[in-house]
Amino acid sequence: MARRLAGVCTLTALVACGEAGPTLAEREAAARAAQEAADQAMRQRTRAAREADRLAAAWRYQQATIGGGAQVTAAIFAAEDVDTDGHGARAVQLVFRDHEEWGRSAYLVLEAGDFACRPRCTVQVSADDREPQPLAAWRPETDEAIAMFIEGTAAFWRLTGDAARLTIAFPVTAGGTRTATFDVAGLDESKMPGW
């Protein structure tokens, strides 16, 4: 009996001193907090996966025979349309091309307006928050497409592959320069073998 009483007294003393552990309300609050943290982590993973899918879907890859040779392209539109001719914002596209006879090239395509880049010009290219880099460019003597080729294709490709966002400032015939920003993080480099 004395032993039993000593155990009860010890238990009572522990409870009275607050060493019995968290209360039911505290345990429930901790469980809710843990569940909220797990739910938040799941929402973040879902958002990240959705964003990765969006970025990957922004790129278009094509294989075709053009001009008698096999060609592979990776193309993406600017995140926002750009007013290149003073008549409203239109799409600007960035294309990487590998043609078995013409070689590798990178170029911009406008839906309206034109590049002020005949015979040559300089564009400013920046990756993410890095300082802009000047790259030589040129506009071919053709009216088949409104395209401007960017030189230093290999370096430009590497810059694109390392970036989440690529910003290109280019001159236009409407006057001044325009800037197009491309969300390039979803680039699948395996679609352009050998680059």
Predicted regions: what they are:
Residues 1-15:
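Sec-dependent bacterial lipoprotein signal peptides
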Residues 18-195:
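A generic "folded-domain core" signal
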